[in-house]
Amino acid sequence: MLIKVKTLTGKEIELDIDPNDKVSRIKERVEEKEGIPPSQQRLIYAGKQMADDKNAESYHLEGGSVLHLVLALRGGSC
């Protein structure tokens, strides 16, 4: 099924995924297209952060679903 991942810059990345794909696999696909390491990615769907060990089906993703990509940048202490 075809889903979209929307970045904070408004760019939309189209991905063809399987309902059994884990969120970690979706993050790997985003890395292939955008070069962002999965460890820095946070995927949000329906207002909730998606867990790496769950699959697309468990979040009720359908063709045309839009995920939001937020970057989790590691910072030092202030």
Curated annotation (Swiss-Prot):
Q: Mind telling me which PROSITE patterns this protein's record contains? A: UBIQUITIN_1, UBIQUITIN_2
What's a single GO CC term here?
cytosol
List the GO molecular function terms. protein tag activity; ubiquitin protein ligase binding
* GO biological processes: modification-dependent protein catabolic process; protein neddylation; regulation of proteolysis
Gene3D superfamilies named among the record's database cross-references: Phosphatidylinositol 3-kinase Catalytic Subunit, Chain A, domain 1
The domain of life for this entry's organism is: Eukaryota
Q: Which UniProt keywords apply?
A: Ubl conjugation pathway
SMART domains named among the record's database cross-references: UBQ (SM00213)
Record-linked PANTHER family: UBIQUITIN (PTHR10666)
**What family is it from?**
Belongs to the ubiquitin family.
Task: Tell me what this protein is called.
Answer: Ubiquitin-like protein 1
